[in-house]
């Protein structure tokens, strides 16, 4: 049975619409209008168009952050993807850890990104759930009322090198240089931060779980479902992704199926500053990256060898 970790009133969340200006060299945004709650924000996320993907000025519904999180585990690097049922779009995708930026953090989106890692990527050990550090700052423990966090061996979260083109919040340049794109179907500005998560070697065995909030009966509810970890690892080779997905439970990697899988729009092609797609099929993304799916493991080769052996015995019997 899924375990309820927390309930929130969505009306407590407030954000602001944005005015965004983009040129081929940089992008800037600033808040406009009146604060909106979660429901009002969803209602405002309607498709927009821009005449030139490199140069435009437009008003958008909200600011979102995503984290392309690289986990180092047993001397290998993996990207972290999480499963999400997107209630506002009626689909299920694998996406980067992500969330909405509240009004008071519009000029500090990195702070929101760090909190999203703490909320959506849960690391379990036999002694409890790992706490985390970003540089010298403790990450929040969002489910401390329901889960036992251990501080003795925290994971560490560090920023990686950012995108080439700068992004400004008002007159303030975001030092971490997140990748930015305007998602036209939802009229939102999205910032993607590259981060690395190191798990202490002593914290073994580990299991990884994803927890996300769902809107239920006018409440935001977060549940932990052990039978559906909903967190997937994509292995990297020399920094490039491989066409494989795994879940991790008690230090054991288990392959995850990819049939009919869709990835969120952050994996789709970006044209200038804009992304036009709602989502992208797993197979199409592999093709876009120049990859092919791994061949399915079958017993054909083993069966063929056995058949040859039997054929040899049969021939031997006939020649006698």
Regions of interest found by a model, annotated:
Residues 1-115, 122-320:
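N-terminal leader/linker segments that precede catalytic domains of diphosphate-processing enzymes
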């Amino acid at each position: 049975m899924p375990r309820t970790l927390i309930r929130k009133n969505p009306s407590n969340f407030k954000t602001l619409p944005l005015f965004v200006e983009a040129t081929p060299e940089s992008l800037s945004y600033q808040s406009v209008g009146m604060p909106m709650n979660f429901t009002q924000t969803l209602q405002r996320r309607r498709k927009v168009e821009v005449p030139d993907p490199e140069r435009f000025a437009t008003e958008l519904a909200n600011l979102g952050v995503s984290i392309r999180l690289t986990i180092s585990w047993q001397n290998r690097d993996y990207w972290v993807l999480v499963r999400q049922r997107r209630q506002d779009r009626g689909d299920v995708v694998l996406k980067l850890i992500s969330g909405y930026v509240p009004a008071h953090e519009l000029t500090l989106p990195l702070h929101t990104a760090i909190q999203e890692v703490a909320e959506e990527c849960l690391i379990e050990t036999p002694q409890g759930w790992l706490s985390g550090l970003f540089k010298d700052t403790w990450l929040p423990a969002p489910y401390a009322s329901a889960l036992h966090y251990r501080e003795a061996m925290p994971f560490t979260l560090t920023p990686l090198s950012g995108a080439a083109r700068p992004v400004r919040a008002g007159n303030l340049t975001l030092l971490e240089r997140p990748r930015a794109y305007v998602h036209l179907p939802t009229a939102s500005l999205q910032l993607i931060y590259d981060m690395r998560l190191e798990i202490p070697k002593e914290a073994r065995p580990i299991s990884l779980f994803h927890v996300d909030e769902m809107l239920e009966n006018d409440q935001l509810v977060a549940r932990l479902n052990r039978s559906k970890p909903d967190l997937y690892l994509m292995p990297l080779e020399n920094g490039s992704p491989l066409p494989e997905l795994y879940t991790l439970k008690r230090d054991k990697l288990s392959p995850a199926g990819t049939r009919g899988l869709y990835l969120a729009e952050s994996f789709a092609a970006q044209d200038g500053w804009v992304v036009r797609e709602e989502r992208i099929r797993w197979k199409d993304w592999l093709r876009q990256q120049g990859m092919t799916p791994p061949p399915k493991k079958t017993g054909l080769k083993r069966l063929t060898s056995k058949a040859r052996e039997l054929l040899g015995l049969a021939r031997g019997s006939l020649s006698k």
